[in-house]
Amino acid sequence: MNYQLIGNGELSSQIGIILPTYREEENISKLIEAIENLKIDASILVIDDSSPDGTAKIVKEKQSKYNNIRLMIRPKKSGLGTAITDGFRFFLSLKQMPKYVMTMDADYSHNPKDIPRLLSTMYENDCAIVIGSRYVKGGKIEGWPFTRKIISRTANSIAKFSLGLKPRDCTSGFRCYSTKFLTEAISNLHSHTYEIQIETIRQASLRNFNMKETPVLFVNRKSGKSKLTSTEIRSYLTYTLKAISRS
């Protein structure tokens, strides 16, 4: 996909963090600051789908303060799945490729303070994917309406039982990936929206890669509007059905 990449200089961090954004001017500044305050060896890639608010402007301001931030501006809203795969390709193309790539929501539903926990699980278990899980012991969701909880539980049940996937939380977007796995799987990632979460787990499962879950607290966004639409729910169900037919 065509995009404009803003930011100069070589990146050489051990960790790449992908932050897909659309209309996140109320959240992106404090999220970037929270990540920077962790003092980990990480580079941040914000992928913005030409938000009509001030998201990109805020990121550019942060770039004047931190040299480890890159901004990818895509011409239009193109889906979470393509944003994440564009982010994967960006980090895999670096001269000094990071060892791990993380994904998380830019609306502060995922707490940056949980990043070290995901990384520790990755270091200890040498996984393809570590999932920040809402559904293992210690994991929790705050602020979701009952209908959203039902949708999430149903989506996870469909993925687990129809595709034979082992993780309890197959739809969490808070993750750490090894670039060893991403290098093998990237050509098989074709999702456009939220089904990317299922597709990556399925690709790891098909290749017999190890996956682990670590508990996190998911807090429903307090600022801005939810990005999950009925179209994206249909895309998720369509992908799952296609995957079943290929099994």
Q: Where are the predicted features?
A:
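Active-site beta-to-alpha loop of glycosyltransferases that engages the nucleotide-sugar donor
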Residues: 19-33, 50
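Short hydrophobic beta-strand elements that form part
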Residues: 16-20, 45-46, 73
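Acidic helix N-cap motif at the loop->helix transition within catalytic regions
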Residues: 26-30, 53-62
